[in-house]
UniProtKB/Swiss-Prot annotation:
It is an enzyme of class 5 (isomerase). It comes from Synechococcus sp. (strain CC9311). The keyword Nucleotidyltransferase does not apply. Responsible for synthesis of pseudouridine from uracil-55 in the psi GC loop of transfer RNAs. One of its GO terms (molecular function) is RNA binding. The keyword Transferase does not apply. CDD domains: PseudoU_synth_EcTruB. This is tRNA pseudouridine synthase B. It catalyses: uridine(55) in tRNA = pseudouridine(55) in tRNA. Belongs to the pseudouridine synthase TruB family. Type 1 subfamily. The active site is at residue 41. HAMAP family: TruB_bact. Keywords: Isomerase, tRNA processing. The gene is truB. InterPro entries: PsdUridine_synth_cat_dom_sf, PsdUridine_synth_N, tRNA_psdUridine_synth_TruB, TruB_C.
Length: 297
């Protein structure tokens, strides 16, 4: 039987780490070669793309932008910049109209400098920031540029001090940091109340399924076989090069292929629409193999 290859999109439930979801999928699919595209904090729900088999090699080529729907709690500051952490300050929030609150969001639209939360997966001298934070260390995490492509105010509840936002942003953006920084800008502090990811790496909620239960762990009907999303469907933003049978043989042996159009990463397909890998087009009218699924000596 051919090894599985493709993507499955999980609607991650609250309370599980992204790694726990990957571990579950390894048991369900009975393969170790499983990886995820974009870590979600345990409390966060929503779209978690899972790559299976050689599709794990395609993760760097997927579009990195993500979309979230979140609720920010003003007036509360915590050690983790969300309600999962220890409350360190409580203040009154300002009496703002919907229009004034929307204007307050303007400095956070576009490309901004953002400091990651103290409790985050950012590497600091080879160690995750959250590991050092658990030891009580306060880390100086430098700001880094992120892009918030759109920031929409969905609802502002003054009585509760809660605002609901939809955020479309670049990879590496922390919505917890956005909540913290907005609270600081308003002079009242703030943290993330809840968060759901609605789009990641080109996959949306409509692609997502509930996290499957391993057959040995369920008491109900047997698990339906999972249908993996073909890898080329996740790479629609890239150009395509279809190979002839002769070119396919050359490709499998790692030889360059004549290629006249475009440059950069290119999806390589067979004549029967099977993905063969990723090539890098160059200015010399060549397509150089970068990821080859059917490699031969």
């Amino acid at each position: 039987m051919d090894a599985p290859l493709g993507f499955v999109v999980i609607d991650k439930p609250s309370g599980l780490t992204s790694h726990a979801c990957v571990s579950r999928m390894r048991r369900v699919l009975q393969t170790k070669r499983v990886g995820h595209g974009g870590t979600l904090d345990p409390a966060v729900t929503g779209v978690l793309p899972i790559a299976v088999g050689q599709a794990t090699r395609l993760l760097p080529y997927l579009p990195g932008e993500k979309t979230y729907r979140g609720v920010i709690q003003l007036g509360t500051s915590t050690s983790t910049d969300d309600l999962q952490g220890e409350i360190v300050a409580v203040q009154n929030w300002p009496d703002l109209s919907v229009e004034e609150m929307d204007q307050a969001l303007n400095p956070f639209r576009g490309t901004i400098e953002q400091c990651p939360p103290q409790v985050s997966a950012v590497h600091v001298n080879g160690e995750r920031a959250y590991a050092r934070a658990r030891r009580g260390e306060v880390i100086d995490l430098p700001a880094r540029p992120v892009t918030i492509h759109s920031l929409s105010l969905e609802h502002w509840d003054f009585e509760q001090g809660k605002l609901t936002l939809e955020v479309h942003c670049s990879a590496g953006t922390y919505i917890r940091s956005l909540a913290r920084d907005l609270g600081q800008a308003l002079g009242c502090g703030g943290c993330l109340d809840s968060l759901r990811r609605t789009q990641a790496l080109g996959f949306v909620e409509a692609h997502a399924i509930a996290l499957p239960v391993h057959p040995n762990e369920q008491s109900g009907p047997s698990l339906e076989p999972l249908t993996l999303i073909p890898p080329q469907l996740a790479l629609k933003h890239l150009p395509i090069r279809t190979l002839s049978e002769l070119e396919r043989d050359d490709w499998s042996c790692g030889r360059t292929i004549p290629h006249q159009n475009g440059d950069g990463p290119t999806v390589v397909l067979s004549e029967d629409n099977i993905m063969l890998g990723i090539g890098l087009a160059n200015s010399e009218a060549q397509l150089r193999p970068k990821v080859v699924f059917e490699a031969r000596g």
